[in-house]
């Protein structure tokens, strides 16, 4: 079997807290950009595990339409607030579906925030400034939240079937997915004489309980685990190497910067910096290129666009 080109995974941009990331995968042979992009996107959204509250218990409340004396918000509003809670439950301490309880009991007049919750070991609240409820004069908030690790989305009706639901507990909708947004795009890429290649770009935003790069890694692991059942149907095929060793055309990398059709200003800056070939250019990181004397933003953009159009990228910092 003719082997496929080995693609390279590159981090293009990352948020300061790492809950956002933009990544590229190239070169891919024609058709694999959409194939991989769509599969990873759907797996990220539907199957990435996370933590969520699925039920609550409030002293004085028997259902979600109750109003509690001394609490400004009714139970419906409190539930809406709780559904915005971002949790991280340590999977090395708690097994799948193991329930943890987050509690608060307060009679102090004023707002109660997520950061006021009493947490068991291995449980973390990431948005501690989230308002849970407001206690007025003479009020008492006695609240227990029931949370666990799982995946997907479950309605309050689904959660009524949980085995540990007891009288007095109010089930709520639970969204276990830590993924807020996934987008992908596919562009053409070129390496040497090969012009029918593709570049996949992925953008992932999470709720902060997992980094964007870890989310992609987990989603990919889930995909591969399911595909292995098909691979193992034939032992001979299961050991077949279908991805080749990365053999970027040396002649392509040895092209001089004069051959890359840069404007004279960009060309002069590169030459003064001792960059004479494409190989020398892509061994620099973007900060090193940007710090070249007299290289302005327009020239930097020109150089970045040229490198990207060749299906290449600068060295990561």
UniProtKB/Swiss-Prot annotation:
GO terms for molecular function: DNA binding; DNA-directed RNA polymerase activity; protein dimerization activity. Keywords: DNA-directed RNA polymerase, Nucleotidyltransferase, Transcription, Transferase. InterPro entries: DNA-dir_RNA_pol_insert, DNA-dir_RNA_pol_RpoA/D/Rpb3, DNA-dir_RpoA, RBP11-like, RNAP_asu_C, RNApol_insert_sf. Pfam families: RNA_pol_A_bac, RNA_pol_A_CTD, RNA_pol_L. One of its GO terms (cellular component) is cytoplasm. Gene3D superfamilies: 5' to 3' exonuclease, C-terminal subdomain (1.10.150.20), DNA-directed RNA polymerase, insert domain (2.170.120.12), RNA polymerase, RBP11-like subunit (3.30.1360.10). GO terms for biological process: DNA-templated transcription. Its EC number is 2.7.7.6. Belongs to the RNA polymerase alpha chain family. The N-terminal domain is essential for RNAP assembly and basal transcription, whereas the C-terminal domain is involved in interaction with transcriptional regulators and with upstream promoter elements. This is DNA-directed RNA polymerase subunit alpha. It comes from Mycoplasma capricolum subsp. capricolum (strain California kid / ATCC 27343 / NCTC 10154).
